[in-house]
Amino acid sequence: SGSCTTQTCWLQLPEFREVGNYLKEKYHRALKVDLLRGAGNSAASRGAIAETFSSISRKELVHLEDSPDYCLENRTLGLPGTEGRECLKKGKNLSKWEKRSCKRLCGECGLAVEERKAEMVSSCNCKF
């Protein structure tokens, strides 16, 4: 009698956090490529573009324009900036990520955290 074995191959993605960290690293090391605007579609300009990209590894992330400064308000792009934004620092059931939101929103943009306390008066519809 004979025996059979079955082999199956598949690709599996790594953990989502690992993919995110990899992409974040690529983003921070991305190469800016300057292409001449209005250079046309001539053979010479196509050759220059091909030469520019041939010197860049296929594994590198490239961009044509700088990313906006997310710390600053930019109404055109709909970015609120970080100045004056509320952050969660204390409270029950907050994750580590949420507790560090003040540091991310303010600290990484060179701003200080301003703590404000407010007294709220409201009707509780109490019956005695």
From Swiss-Prot:
Keyword list, A-Z: Developmental protein, Disulfide bond, Extracellular matrix, Glycoprotein, Lipoprotein, Secreted, Wnt signaling pathway
Presence of the UniProt keyword Phosphoprotein in the record: no
Glycosylation sites (chain numbering): 74, 93
Lipidated residue numbers (O-palmitoleoyl serine): 1
Disulphide bridges: 71-109, 87-102
Similarity-based family: Belongs to the Wnt family.
Role played: Ligand for members of the frizzled family of seven transmembrane receptors. Probable developmental protein. May be a signaling molecule which affects the development of discrete regions of tissues. Is likely to signal over only few cell diameters.
Protein name: Protein Wnt-8
Biological source species: Thunnus thynnus
Gene from which the chain derives: wnt8
